[in-house]
Amino acid sequence: MFDEIDIHILEILQEKARIPNAEVARQVGMAPSAVLERIRKLEERGIIEGYEVRLNPACFHQGLSAFVQIETDGTDAQTATSLSAIPSVQEVHQVVGPDGFLVKLRTADHTTLAKILQQIRPLAGVKSMRTQVVLETVKETRRVDLTEHNGNSRH
């Protein structure tokens, strides 16, 4: 499904998505047109889902992170859709166990957090909630560990 060159290209793009194609080609030792074709195929296959800018949440008065564990009554599809529609909600994960969902959200402060929780509480399917406020984020990434795929890393 992947070869070593694909893995190397993916490692480079995960490090810096805006790197010029010519630089990727130089690093993998291929012609820019061949690298561009590989990247296009990785995109078509859904391996590369997209490219995005990571913003500093504190610069937008969203420095407070919280995780909300939500127990549901079984109407999970409707609950997931409703949770996903809340702008401060960044992630919605359906989980195994007594909780139906684990939700990550960002907001300005505790007052705003309380308002968002008041939006969540009456949603269809929500039975109970437990909230954990993040004191400090030690690591946060969307990178995929490619060393498990090919057994080694170039870093």
List each model region and its residues.
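A compositional/biophysical signature of low hydrophobicity enriched in polar/charged and small residues
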Residues: M1-H155
